[in-house]
Each structure stands twice: as C-alpha cells, then as structure tokens.
Regions:
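Short strand-turn segments of transmembrane beta-barrel domains in outer membranes
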Residues: 24-97, 122-126
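Transmembrane beta-strands of outer-membrane beta-barrel pores
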Residues: 82-86, 99-101, 110-114, 151-157, ...
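Transmembrane beta-barrel wall of Gram-negative outer-membrane proteins
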Residues: 83-112, 121-157, 168-190, 236-241, ...
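Membrane-embedded beta-barrel scaffold of Gram-negative outer-membrane proteins
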Residues: 102, 191-206, 357, 363-369, ...
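Flexible loop and strand-edge segments within Gram-negative outer membrane beta-barrel domains
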Residues: 113, 144-191, 195-227, 258-261, ...
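Outer-membrane beta-barrel domain signature, especially the mid-to-C-terminal portions
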Residues: 122-125, 164-167, 203-208, 258, ...
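Signature of Gram-negative outer-membrane beta-barrel scaffolds
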Residues: 245-247, 251-363, 367, 374-375, ...
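Gram-negative outer-membrane beta-barrel transporters
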Residues: 290-297, 306, 427, 433-443, ...
Length: 625
C-alpha cells in the first residue's frame, strides 16, 4: 500500500532507473486528510537547516546554501552536522564509504524541539525529542549485479500535540529494506527485486505531557503495525521503446486499542483498529516510445486488489459493568450493515502521456489518467464510540475512489540558464526559467470524512465522525519563475492555488491549501576562505475564504485563518568544501500566523488551531574529514 511516510526507501545509492515506473499506480493519490508519522531521516535529509516545526508552513524549495559543498562531499567519508536555535537543536553523525565492489553508510541523529511562543507571545506547548540510527551496505560483484541491505531505527518521544486530544508519547519504527538488481545497469534488460519490512509501535495518552481536567477520564491509545512489501519488476529497452512489467504484494497487520485508566489499571474501552490483516496485490505494465527526439508518448495499465480481514470486529470491550460495542455493532448502527467475512476492493487504472521537446530549452507535457485509490484503515475501519461529536466510526463498505485526471505542464528556459543562480556562457540576459503546471481531477466515489446527520445511507444523527463516498472536483495550478540578475544575484518566485469542491453536497472540501506566493532573493559569491551565500524570502498566504468549518453542515475541520506574510533570512559560508556555517532568522517581523498544515503527522480529526513560532534564530555547522 501507500504509506510513503511510513515506508521510505533508504535512498543512499542512486535509484535503479531514471524513468518513472507504474504509471497507472493506485498509490498516486492520497487521502484529502492524512494520518501518518513523519518521514524517516535518510542521509539525503538536509541538516543544518532550521529544525522542523510541525506547525509552520513547508517551503516550496530548499534554500540555496554553500554548506551543501560540505554535506555532499563524498571524498571525505565522515561528516558531523549540528544546529541550535531558540526553538531547539539537532545533531547528526554520518559515515559513507565506497570501494570497488562495496559501498555503505551509517548514521546517527538526534533532534529536540522545545515549547515555543507565537508572534503574540502566547506559549505553545509543542515539541518532541527524536533519535535514530541507520546502516546500509551495498555489494556490486560485477556490472550486471547489485545488492543492497539497509536498516533504520527511528524513535520519537514526547511528541506534544496541542492540536489533538492526546500526545504521541512514543513512536518507534524499525525498517528493513533489501534490493537486488539482476541485469544491465542502465535498466535496458534488468530484473529488480525489493523486499521491505516495517514494525511500528506507537503510544499516545492525555495525561503524561498535559494536565487532565478534574473528573475527566485518563485514556491512552496503543498502536502496533507490521507491514511487509515484496516487489519484482522487469525492464527492457528495444530501439526507441522501453517496457516495464511489475508485480507487488503487501501484507499489513494493524491493531490499535484505546484504554481507560481505572483504579484496577488500564482497561480497554474501544478498538481503533480491531486487528486488521490486509493482503494487497498490484500488477502493472508501462510502455515508453520515443517517436522522434522531440516526441515521446508513455502509457500504463494496472490492476489493484486489496483484501482486508478485521479479526476482532465482533469483540466488544467492557470496564466493570459498563459494556462498549464491538466494531461490527458500531458499523451496523451507523451504516445499517455489519461486516461479514473479509472485504475485497479492486480496480483497474490507466494512464497516457505525451511529451514534446522542440528544443533543449522547452518542454511541454499533457497527461490523462483514470486511476483508483483504495480506502485506508482510518477511513473504513476506525471504531471509536464517543459522545458530543467525539466518536469516530469508519465505513467498512467504502468503494475505491476513481480519479479521472488531466494534467498540463510546461518549462521554458533562456539560452543562459544553467541552474538557479548559475549563468551559462556569461549569457546573463538568457539566464531565466519559467515553469507552469495545472491539473483537473473529477473524482467519483471520493472518500470524505463527515459527521453523522442522517444522510443517505447513514442511520445515526449524533454528529460523530463518519466516512462516505461522494463526487468531488479538485483543481490545482502553480507557476514559478527564476532569473539571474547578475553573476552573483538571483531571484525566484512561485504561486500556488488549489480548489476543492464536494459536488454531492455542494460545499467546499476541507483541508485545501489557500492561495500562496513565495519570493526569494539570493546572493552567492567566492571569498579568499571559500564561498558564501545570503538570502531572503517572503511567504504570503491568502485567507482561507473557502473552508469546511461548520460541524452542523459539514465536517467542521477548518478554522478561519487570516492572510499573512512572513519574511525569513538565511546565509552560509564554507571553506575548502570541508567546514561550513549556516545561520538564519525565521519570521523576521515576529508575526502571529496560522499556517496551512500539510504534514500528516499533525493531523487531528477535531483539531485545535496552533500558531506558528515567533521570531526564531538558528545557527548550524557541518564538518567532514
């Protein structure tokens, strides 16, 4: 299944292929509102940048930094990185080595985020402590074989969640990843094999990191998940055509239980996920055809099948003389149907794209696809009874989404463009680039969270969270431009817009990004000691005038936010590609603002608004030897 935040590749060696594979994948689309831990930290994760804050906006690009000359220098195997600021600190030790037949890497890291104040001086009880290790070993016996094995341990402790009713006091993941390439290194006649296993252990409660109100119950949630993915694909090139065929299998076991603390100890009062065992099969075929050097078409077909067995769906909970309904009883009450036996959903996907490159400075692409998205466990198997709109009852009878999607993209470059901030052959006037993209997605059976109000197919009217299939429209557009103003000074900008509509209920979709704009100005130059750069960026977000904020007519997830603008400063210097210092100031003018939050590990179904941090200063360094 998907879970890109849960199951990242150990991206240490180069990817096996440049071409995108599985063009008609069922994993292309994510839920409108997602729940998953943050990405695992790999050697490619930027350090020395500001410490991640869950409640600030995500940048549209990585700020340029000459410190990358140090962090990407592989001629010296050992690297130490650290940063500190008024929000917290982070440290990493990374060792990389490559020989004629062997290559490997190990790393250890720690991150700590403190409570902080927002721009008005109000304290926000957020923060976490995170640590982990990674080890990877690769073996290349000859040009036609490559094998790689990697292990990651990632642990997050005391993750305060002010937007949520509970705090994630423990999240631990163990990820084991194995890869094999058999055949040509350029993927012209090659078999690729991948095996990946993850163990997730998570505990959340409402009492360790916050004060529980008198007479309020003290509760905790314990989550265990085990997932194994096996993938095999074959890729072949003949003339100007390439084909990929692949088969994937996934096994997922997911159990989550809610407990109330009583004088007799912790007693279960509900299952969030009642021991779900899923088998996922995915078969795909892709084909690429270079008609001429300027024209390429590509297409793909896929078949996706997901079977889920909820082992404890008929197991009720009990505390003393108080009985709590089994998951199947809840599903019967809300949807009029219990889940008998296993639940299987399947679908076919198709994708077609045409790319036109009239010159090396222009590229145009149009793509159309019709793909499914399978329902995820929170959407269909959650079984948490509650009162006053605090219950959450998934819908086990959800259908897969059907996305009918068209996308357009174009890139134009001047004759002097080499990269951002770099000029080709001294052609300053031609050192520019424009990128634009737009997409339109008409979704049949879109899976939406909602509240029980006796809608068609809903048998309760108590305001608890439910899931439904509706029709929806999603539209997105963005345009970006970059220009070198001199051999040292460059500027760039990006504007992004999203639109979402629940067509069945004639209301705005929840959790849709408002109009945003980003502008940056960057200076880079050489000095006797090495090189340095300075930069400033402005981020603007429009007020969220389209939102789902009324719990009596919709989900009520969104809260009104005003438009805002914030300015960040940053810079770095490095000497001899060996030692670098980075520094910066975020939220320079100390504005209080609420950012659109697209990080799934902060998702809450009944969220409280959380402001971004006040003005923050950070200083980092890295050193390799």
């Amino acid at each position: 299944m998907k879970l890109p935040y849960l199951l990242p590749l150990l991206a240490v060696a180069a990817a096996h292929a440049e071409e995108k594979t599985d063009l008609a994948t069922a994993d292309a689309y994510r839920p409108q509102y997602d729940f998953s831990p943050p990405p695992v930290i790999t050697p490619q994760t930027p350090f020395g940048q500001p410490l991640e804050n869950q409640f600030d906006y995500q940048r549209p690009w990585v700020n340029p930094s000459v410190a990358q000359n140090v962090s990407t220098n592989t001629t010296r195997p050992l690297q130490i990185e650290a940063s500190i600021g008024n929000l917290g600190d982070q440290e990493r030790l990374l060792y990389r080595q490559r020989g004629s037949n062997l290559y490997g890497a190990v790393q250890a890291y720690r991150l700590h985020l403190d409570d902080y104040k927002d721009g008005s001086g109000q304290r926000v009880h957020a923060g976490y402590t995170r640590d982990g290790e990674m080890a990877m070993l690769g073996f290349v016996p000859d040009a036609r074989q490559e094998y790689r094995l990697g292990v990651v341990r990632d642990h997050i402790a005391d993750d305060k969640q002010p937007q949520h009713q509970m705090d994630a006091v423990k999240t631990q993941r163990i990820v084991v990843n194995a890869n094999a390439r058999l055949g040509a290194q350029d993927q012209s006649n090659t078999i690729n094999l991948t095996a990946r296993h993850i163990e997730l252990d998570r505990t959340a409660n409402n009492y360790k990191l916050r004060t529980t109100a008198p007479n309020s119950p003290r509760v905790k949630m314990e989550v265990e998940r085990s997932k194994t993915d096996l993938n095999a694909d074959y890729r072949i090139q003949y003339g100007e055509q390439r084909s990929h065929i692949g088969l994937q299998y996934g096994r997922d076991s997911h159990n989550a239980e809610r407990f109330a603390l009583t004088p007799q100890g912790a007693r279960r009062n509900a299952y969030r996920f009642a021991d779900i065992h899923s088998d996922h099969y995915h078969l795909y075929y892709d084909h690429y055809w270079n008609l001429t050097p300027e024209h390429q078409i590509s297409g793909g077909l896929s078949y996706d099948r997901l079977t889920a067995d909820v082992k404890k769906k008929n197991t009720p909970s009990k505390i003393g003389e108080q009985n709590f309904p089994a998951p199947n009883q809840l599903w019967q009450q809300y949807y009029g149907r219990a889940l008998n036996g296993k639940r299987t959903t399947s679908g076919v996907g198709a994708a077609l794209a045409y790319e036109f490159r009239p010159s090396e400075r222009q590229k145009y692409r149009i793509g159309v696809d019709s793909r499914i998205r399978q329902p995820e466990n929170p959407e269909r198997f959650t079984s948490l009874p509650g009162q006053n709109g605090m219950g959450w009852i998934g819908n086990p009878h959800l259908k897969p989404e059907r996305h009918n999607h068209i996308s357009l993209a174009a890139t134009w470059q001047g004759t002097g463009w080499r990269d951002y901030g770099k000029v080709r052959n001294g052609d300053l006037a031609g050192a520019w680039q424009i990128e634009a993209a737009a997409d339109y997605d008409k979704v049949h059976d879109f899976i939406t969270y909602d509240r029980a109000r006796g809608q068609n197919g809903i048998h309760k009217n108590d305001g608890n969270i439910i899931s439904r299939n509706v029709d929806a429209t999603l539209i997105g557009a963005e345009i970006g431009a970059a220009k070198s103003l001199s051999t040292n000074l460059a500027a760039r900008s990006k504007i992004r817009y999203q639109y979402g509509e629940n067509d069945s209920d004639n209301r705005a979709l929840y959790h849709v990004r408002p109009l945003t704009a980003d502008i940056a100005l960057d200076w880079r130059d050489y000095a006797p000691f090495g090189s340095y750069n300075l930069g400033v960026n402005l981020h603007y977000a429009h007020k969220n005038s389209r939102r789902d904020s009324n719990k009596t007519t919709g989900l009520g997830l969104d809260y009104p936010t005003a438009g805002y603008a914030t300015v960040n400063l940053y810079g770095s210097l490095q000497t001899r590609d060996r030692f670098a210092i980075t520094l910066g100031v975020n939220n320079l003018f100390n504005r209080r603002y609420f950012a659109y939050n697209e990080q799934p590990h902060t998702a809450a179904i009944n969220p409280n608004p959380v402001a971004a941090p006040e003005r923050s200063v950070w200083l980092g360094f890295n050193y390799n030897f």
